[in-house]
Amino acid sequence: MREIVHLQAGQCGNQIGAKFWEVISDEHGIDPTGAYHGDSDLQLERINVYYNEATGGKYVPRAVLVDLEPGTMDSVRSGPFGQIFRPDNFVFGQSGAGNNWAKGHYTEGAELVDSVLDVVRKEAESCDCLQGFQLTHSLGGGTGSGMGTLLISKIREEYPDRIMNTFSVVPSPKVSDTVVEPYNATLSVHQLVENTDETYCIDNEALYDICFRTLKLTTPTYGDLNHLVSATMSGVTTCLRFPGQLNADLRKLAVNMVPFPRLHFFMPGFAPLTSRGSQQYRALTVPELTQQMFDAKNMMAACDPRHGRYLTVAAIFRGRMSMKEVDEQMLNVQNKNSSYFVEWIPNNVKTAVCDIPPRGLKMSATFIGNSTAIQELFKRISEQFTAMFRRKAFLHWYTGEGMDEMEFTEAESNMNDLVSEYQQYQDATAEEEGEFEEGEEEENA
């Protein structure tokens, strides 16, 4: 079987990671002790992708949990599925990274990284044919962003031909923990551009807006945001965990989704959107799902896809439904909105259907888009970065850990290059100039 080793780093990474394991364990019929109580062969057919089978028929997640302080990992361990993880796979320091990327990447994190790699190596060795790694982390803090990107580059060094996939939570002023988030995020993106094969941008701004506007939650908690993240992560990994044809492994997904190596930042979406504890039981139709899934309001990245064009799209439908109807609806979307799909990649929308719906829903749809509109997210971070960096605000926290200002300048220009590359492919051979007036102004800015 083609196995995936999962890593989670930092507070955010461990919280969404723990939630991910709760959701997929439930979908595969695995209880908190690792025992199987399922009702369908489909649940076990590809169980080896994410789980090791241990003695006594117990299933153990191929997960490595990393943090620079013990707090979050203690709560994961005492949480609902805390006992399912292999105890040796908790690797933590005591000092904390204090939301400082340099501490995670160069000082504190660098001291812990070798013990993490030992655990990763052990997990990789127990694999029959490792396809790659996935990391859950945030880009705003110190550990997930600094040490997370350090782990990525170390794993890249040791396993250069394996796919590296990240679920990266992008900071937002609306849900902010620290003032230095733009620094940490920019330094991280600088690493992700070079060292990952696919990155799902999960944007706190979008999650917050969904909770607030769509789900009508007046004060969204991290629990509410994480509920959305886990639904999305469960959706985008469906093809990897259940038998099927399309995008059945990380490499095939990358081949379908990434036309240019640097442009691998995906915008995930999910339909129907439900709040925690109130899954609606109203029956959805395939046309409704399709329409919702392409709607800007359902995107987990705060970018409007109508401001850009899709290079590629993958859609995953879950539940019992007619394949024919799904194909018709997907074609319908493309024909009606053809100007939003680049014409120089024909057949750039791929669809998969899985019979098993997520818990509490009859059917659902997950969207993975590689859209040039994702540049809005990088622009947003870049503007915040520049505002502080111009005044060298808070810089001493980073230089004190041995960083150089030059590194900030490089990261800033790499992220700005990324924005220009997205813009370049958005404008490529576009006859219909009308829609791209915004585009030209940004080029000159």
From Swiss-Prot:
SMART domains: Tubulin, Tubulin_C. GO terms for molecular function: GTP binding; GTPase activity; metal ion binding; structural constituent of cytoskeleton. Residues 429-445 have a biased composition (Acidic residues). A motif (MREI motif) lies at residues 1-4. The modification 5-glutamyl polyglutamate is found at residue 438. It is found in: Cytoplasm, Cytoskeleton. Belongs to the tubulin family. This is Tubulin beta-4 chain. It comes from Xenopus laevis. The gene is tubb4.
